[in-house]
């Protein structure tokens, strides 16, 4: 007797394991949505029932209650366009990463300006032509004086604020 597998009999239905994996992915996505702030949740295309469930999520603090509520959110996620939600979440994550990267870059500028010499200041003025060189030199001197006397870094904060304002103006965010 010859046993052979006939591909024509494959109906294209998902296996039970595949369905379970997809449902677990929906629960994981729902858990990710619960960590978002309400203003970010408002940007996502969600049903009212899912919005209410996400708003109720912080109320469930016991482990079993939280797990049960996440299962409920996963059930509600079945009716959602998860591809659109994932796309928007990825955009939000990317914008957050870009913001953090820009923030760290501005911090590095501040630190180099305080520790550096005129060459660093000239490079900064080339990168940010709207910078007021005199004001920046004054803030740098104050910050260096504060560091020398172990005072709180008030001028350092002012430099960062000034640099951030210049950056936002240059990027058209102001």
Swiss-Prot record:
List the source organism: Pseudomonas fluorescens (strain Pf0-1)
Family of the protein in this entry: Belongs to the DarP family.
Q: Name one GO biological process term.
A: assembly of large subunit precursor of preribosome
Task: Give the taxonomic lineage as stored in the record.
Answer: Bacteria, Pseudomonadati, Pseudomonadota, Gammaproteobacteria, Pseudomonadales
State the NCBIfam families in the record: PRK05255.1-1
Q: What does this protein do?
A: Member of a network of 50S ribosomal subunit biogenesis factors which assembles along the 30S-50S interface, preventing incorrect 23S rRNA structures from forming. Promotes peptidyl transferase center (PTC) maturation.
Localization annotation: Cytoplasm
> What is this protein's name?
Dual-action ribosomal maturation protein DarP
What Gene Ontology molecular-function terms does this entry list? ribosome binding; rRNA binding
Q: Which UniProt keywords are present, listed alphabetically? A: Cytoplasm, Ribosome biogenesis, RNA-binding, rRNA-binding
Tell me the HAMAP family matching this sequence.
Answer: DarP
